[in-house]
Amino acid sequence: MFERLYGCTMHSINWQPCFVFHLSIFALRLLLRRSIFESIVVSYLLYVSLGGWRYQRIFILTFLRDLMGLRCILMVQLNVLWLQWTKRTFSDMFEYTVKKRGPENVAIYFEDQVWTFGQLDAYSNKVANYLAKCGFKRGDILLLFMNSCPAYIGIWLGATKVGVATGLVNTNLCKGSLMNCIKTLSARGIVVGSSLKETFETVNEYNDLSLEMIWLVDEKRSLPETAYSNSTSSTCSWNIALAQVPHCAPIPLPRIANLREHLIYVYTSGTTGLPKAAIITKLRYTLLVVGAKYSFGIRQSDIIYDPLPLYHSAGGICGVGQMLLYGNTIVIRSKFSASQFWSDCVKYKCTVAQYIGEICRYLLCQPVRPTDKQHHVRIAFGNGLRPQIWKAFQERFNVKQIGEFYGATESNTNIANMDNKFGAVGYVSKIIDGFYPCYIIKIDVDTKEPIRDPITGLCILCEPNEPGHLVARIGSNDPFRMFDGYVNSEASEKKIIRNVLRKGDLWFASGDLMCCDELGYMYFIDRLGDTFRWHGENVSTSEVERVLDQAIGTLTGTVFGVSIPGTEGKAGMAAIALEGSKLTSIEEENLLCRINEEFTGNLPSYARPLFIRLCQNLTMTGTFKISKAEISRLGFDPNIDPNDHVYFLNPKTKVYQLVDQQLFNDINNGVFIL
């Protein structure tokens, strides 16, 4: 009862101030038999003198902010209720958008192509009819391995029209990682972009991928005019096949009251191991799109610049979803270009732009151009913008609002910076503590395990500005609290913490070190566990270590992330223990060449360690595990231990180069574009 009324548990540390205030009024009236007015005055003075002034200050400073958040939550709730009541499919929602916006209006700008809503609808109808002809049915899975283009959106949109879920494969993957992603979902078929043909064939040639159907699509020749025609200028199998099917709408799917039906799968690096397939349901997709719209005030008239890869949730859901569900025009690119970013925004008259932290740094590194301030972008939203460049980005490019948000693809932890608060990734209300149950708990930095109360066995909440592990309560009946997790149930289980605030409760473990100030603003500090983030991608250290082991044989090695001044995230670094062996310069060079070959052949560019430290020994824990905390403190400084040799992967020569004092200074001073 208490939790339902006040949004927190009886034993939680922070009782609601409003509850205490009302209780004091009741007590005074009962004991002193005073009038209600006198009781209120005395209670208020008592309340303020006992520390209530702090709550009053918080209330005054955050009331309007929290109203914005409440409005956003209410709009999301209304959309969820509407979905539950109407039982609409995702294709129903898009059809409504087409009718509302008009089939002749522009949906997508892509290089020299212009796709209208009608053309996108017709193309997706062709996809749906062809998949149905091939025997695909509701619940089947299709994989997409292609670069961003309008056909990419049309294919997975068409798949949803016949109830087929689509797995969006990271185009940077190769060999083992790519093979794992393909096998994870037990898909019936895959559509491969012509530009990625060779990468796919290296995996398909030597492995049984158990795929019934494989198509090659020509992204450049999947033109808007082919949406209605029966001809094609491409020789690729997918383009030819679509030319032979009609563009009429497929037979509508039966409407079912299942908001958790799988819509797409987004591959993401978890805390350990290979990339995992995160489940994106119709409900989850809607929550992310609606949440972004109302968090940052995106209008239907806005033209959104979305240069992010469409296999990412930021680009493929938060950006593309505004077009599919609300009729916004979007601008996409096959590859991000820092030099063309603002030129594109000017050309297409964009008013909203998306970013990840790396993008903002790349833009600041560009020469000053007139287009820097000739655009009409009023909102830039995304995640990962460092506080160190936040103000510089806003001032140079005259962007009035930064919409920073936080939330992993698979998580139920989604917060947003709605009021342009410098450096914050979002906030939770302190007026109604527990209304949106995201907390920061104390954690053992070495073991990464929660610190628990020795008496109750429950977790301990952090004080304001104290770093800790961000967790969010899981609830099966609350759309905001649902955790769909991964296709692999064991991987999902690893993201759950039990007995946090009460016995038997379930909480999502974000894997991120955060802190929260007294007003409820949250700030990202670092990643926990065996991952680090580089170039906007999560890198699994265990995956890199497996590749490293193939190169170093019986030697012991480990991988971790290190910070480089002036860059976002952490760059990869490998440490290898020679264990008493003394290598000649030629032997050392050969070892580095083998490592470089393995990294280049088996890892995407963002996962390849920039640094290698050759040392005599690695510190072990009491359980005979490598102490990454100890070795990571050394960073890539060659002076800390003169017996170690530190190497840097030179981005120009693509070989590992010995780090001396001059090279160390150059790296720290930003001489290299990393």
Regions inferred by a protein language model and the residue ranges of each:
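Conserved structural elements of the adenylate-forming
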Residues: 121-126, 259, 278-299, 307, ...
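Conserved AMP-binding/adenylate-forming
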Residues: 14-18, 25-44, 110-114, 128-176, ...
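Conserved AMP-binding/adenylation subdomain of ANL enzymes
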Residues: 286-303, 311-351, 366
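Gly/Ser/Thr-rich phosphate-binding loop
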Residues: 325, 347-356, 364-445, 482, ...
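Conserved AMP-binding A3 loop
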Residues: 116-118, 254-256, 263-287
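Conserved C-terminal "lid"/linker of ANL adenylate-forming enzymes
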Residues: 558-563, 573-575, 594-674
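Conserved pre-ATP/AMP-binding loop-to-beta segment of ANL
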Residues: 104, 215-216, 234-236, 243-267, ...
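AMP-binding/adenylate-forming catalytic core of the ANL superfamily
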Residues: 173, 180, 192, 353, ...
